[in-house]
Curated annotation (Swiss-Prot):
Transmembrane segments: none annotated. The gene is glyS. GO terms for biological process: arginyl-tRNA aminoacylation; glycyl-tRNA aminoacylation. It comes from the Bacteria. It is found in: Cytoplasm. PROSITE patterns: AA_TRNA_LIGASE_II_GLYAB (PS50861). Belongs to the class-II aminoacyl-tRNA synthetase family. GO terms for molecular function: arginine-tRNA ligase activity; ATP binding; glycine-tRNA ligase activity. Its EC number is 6.1.1.14. This is Glycine--tRNA ligase beta subunit. The lineage of its organism: Bacteria, Bacillati, Bacillota, Bacilli, Bacillales. Pfam families: DALR_1 (PF05746), tRNA_synt_2f (PF02092). Its main location: cytoplasm.
Length: 693
């Protein structure tokens, strides 16, 4: 008989960022365990709050199915000797299958007799198997863990209670002295402990005790309350998804409430107010319909509406203190000149082996000047880049950024404009940090893009120069994120810069300054490989097929925009019959070209038939076509230049024996193929493209 099963893990409050990954991990482990045990089940529900992780499995079978198996052993001529007695091979097979030799059967397979063993394994009761879930619970991993009392188990937070209920029956096991039972607990202040009679009643029973166990239901309730307040007050409440997720996992019973702050604080930059409310207090800022920030906020309490006015006043008091501090920092910062702030960077260590922040700024200045030239920026933009680079990091020494590190760049822009810098310079200072995370916007201005590239490139290359290379999950300087940011900037801006040239130039510059602790040539190869792997990661995330990505990355690393353009073109063509034929022809050329001897050049005097001359002419047309196409970054035209020589290639192979007996003729034909192959492989390695049968 199928019955529902509930597993609930009660904990001290988990950090909000732990909740979703933890319940996802637990749900995946439980489902994998059920599948491994061969147990049939219905729908699986996940429930998670700061104080509990729970899995409800509907219609869980009461036992495993019986297993009937038949295994083939050795051939009969090996299983029995001349006297008909069982050999060691047969005895060993029978023992391995857990049967007697008298139970072995003989069957013919393709005309040969073999011995077979039939085994019957009775399925175990589910109630006997379920205690194994203890190992799944103790096997959960967390970003940080702790130990408590004298127990050896490391966990996110101390375990407070355990529920394991199969139908009406408790599944017995214990963890760190906590025994499983049917008793769970409601809201810490509004609810009470209570027994569960049946797993199915879990979510509804908790609601009666002021706990909304379903995270999506809590999130929807919060959004609904925010929308209601918007309508009541004619406000606009921008919903930051990260903040919404965090608040959802901070409460078990959400109730939204509003508060206000003094109008005078609106004189502070909008970003300062939003950061103070959102990042430090987990409040939702409130705006007017025209986008102006209003002196109100919305917060979400973990409880009901009782004494809500007092709660609002308490939150207002906390925010007032925070904003007063911010106002003090803001006014104090403006007493320091940009030059004085910049000079303090010489006293801040970026890394003991790479130098100070002042030295980093100098490197950024040199790199950005070179990048601006390579990107063909105009004279005005170059001046903007030069000035922005010179003062790029001055805001790091301000009180405001010291208190709110997430405002670096933003405060640089604000203070730079107040100090008389041009809006273009100020914006570039802000944009140097973009993109800050996956999916974030890239710089809008050319100057900002160049400064962002220089900053990120210096961080990556300088770390590599002293052996700080990401390994596995270890990436303390976020070099993967920095490299990914570089790739997205190059892709969106279409700058004619290659990752390889950028990395090599930056490394050579660092080497000249004496910061290298690693071998230069080895580090260059590590950097090129690192950027290629990051590019592959970004392309796969963009949805390109792995084989097309591998094909494109096998070609020289040209500018990122062109790499993506080639991948898009190949993706569009991938299912065309003609594309398959083109790929086969091009691959045939590149495959045979591997046999070409080095140092041999094509000689028309050694041609013996017209197809050789035609292939040479086609090769010259391909070279010209590719050159013209890449001048305007036209991946389609470049592909067409290759595709148009398909018929000529096929005719050549139909009428010409490449591996001729005469060595000179053979080498000349291989050299001809090698010349064409170089053009083909400059686009992609077509041999890596996979076609479905």
């Amino acid at each position: 008989m199928n019955k529902p099963f509930l597993l609930e893990l009660g904990l001290e409050e988990l950090p909000a960022r732990f909740v979703t990954p933890s319940i996802t991990q637990l749900a995946e482990k439980v489902q994998a365990w059920l599948d491994d045990k061969g147990l049939s089940y219905g729908e699986i529900h996940s429930y998670a709050t700061p104080r509990r992780l729970a899995i409800l499995v509907e219609n869980l079978a009461d036992r495993q199915p019986d297993i009937h198996d038949e295994s083939r052993g050795p051939a009969l001529k090996i299983a029995k000797d001349e006297s008909g007695a069982w050999t060691k091979a047969a005895l060993g097979f029978a023992k391995g299958q857990g049967v007697e030799t008298s139970q072995l059967e003989i069957k013919a397979v393709n005309g040969t007799d073999y011995v077979f063993a039939k085994t019957h394994k009775k399925g175990e009761k589910t109630s006997v198997l379920l205690p194994e879930l203890k190992e799944l619970i103790t096997g959960l991993t967390f970003p940080k863990s702790m130990r408590w009392n004298t127990y050896s188990l490391r966990y996110a937070r101390p375990i407070q209670w355990l529920v394991a209920l199969y139908g009406e029956d408790v599944i017995p096991f214990s963890i760190n002295g906590i025994e499983t039972g049917r008793n769970t607990t409601g809201h810490r202040f509004l609810g009470a402990d209570f027994p569960l009679d049946n797993p199915i009643e879990y979510a509804d029973a908790l609601k009666r005790q002021y706990v909304i166990a379903d995270a999506e239901e809590r999130k929807a309730a919060i959004v609904s309350q925010l929308k209601q307040m918007e309508e009541e007050h004619s406000w606009v409440v921008p919903i930051d998804e990260a903040l919404l997720e965090e608040v959802t996992q901070l409460v078990e019973y959400p109730t939204a409430l509003s508060g206000s702050f003094d109008d005078s604080f609106l004189a502070l930059p909008k970003e300062v107010l939003i950061t103070t409310m959102r990042e430090h207090q987990r409040y939702f800022p409130v705006e007017a319909k025209d986008g102006r920030l209003l002196p109100y906020f919305i917060t979400v309490r973990n409880g009901n509406e009782e004494y809500i006015e007092n709660v609002a006043k308490g939150n207002e008091k906390v925010l007032r203190a925070r904003l007063s501090d911010a106002a003090f920092f803001y006014h104090e910062d403006q007493k320091i000149s940009l030059q004085a702030a910049n000079a303090k960077l010489d006293n801040i260590v970026f890394h003991e082996a790479i130098g100070t922040m002042g030295e980093k700024v100098a490197r950024i200045g040199e790199l950005s000047k070179w990048l601006a030239g390579e990107a063909n920026l105009g004279a005005q933009e170059r001046q903007t880049v030069e000035r922005a680079a010179a003062i790029a990091k001055f805001d790091l020494v301000t009180y405001m950024v010291g208190e709110f590190p997430e405002l670096q760049g933003r405060m640089g822009q604000e203070y730079a404009e107040k100090a008389g810098e041009t809006p273009q310079v100020a914006k570039a200072i802000y944009e140097q940090y973009l993109p800050r995370y996956a999916g974030d916007k890239v710089p809008e201005t050319e100057a900002g893009a160049v400064l962002a590239l220089a900053d990120k490139l210096d961080t990556v290359v300088s770390c590599f120069s002293i052996g700080l290379i990401p390994t596995g999950s270890q990436d303390p300087y976020a070099l993967r994120r920095q490299a990914t940011g570089i790739i997205h900037i190059l892709l969106q801006t279409e700058m004619p810069l290659t990752l390889e040239n950028m990395a090599v130039h930056a490394l050579d510059s660092i080497a000249k300054k004496g910061f290298m602790t690693e071998k230069v040539e080895t580090t260059k190869q590590e950097l090129i490989s690192f950027f290629a792997n990051r590019l592959k990661h970004v392309m796969l995330e963009a949805g390109f097929r792995y084989d097309i990505v591998d094909a494109v990355l096998a070609a020289p690393l040209v500018d990122v925009y062109t790499m993506f353009a080639k991948a898009r073109l190949l993706t569009e063509r991938a299912e065309d019959r003609e594309f398959k034929e083109v790929t086969e022809s091009l691959s045939r050329v590149t495959n045979l070209a591997k046999k070409a001897p080095k140092g041999v050049f094509v000689s028309e005097n050694l041609f013996e038939n017209e197809t050789e001359s035609r292939l040479l002419a086609a090769t010259l047309e391909v070279e010209f076509g590719l050159a013209e196409a890449w001048k305007v970054k036209d991946a389609y035209a470049a592909y067409q230049a290759l595709a148009q020589c398909r018929a000529t290639i096929n005719t050549f192979f139909d009428h010409t024996m490449v591996m001729a007996d005469n060595e000179a003729t053979r080498n000349n034909r291989l050299a001809l193929l090698d010349r064409l192959a170089k053009s083909i492989q400059s686009y992609a390695d077509f041999q890596k493209i996979v076609f479905s049968a």
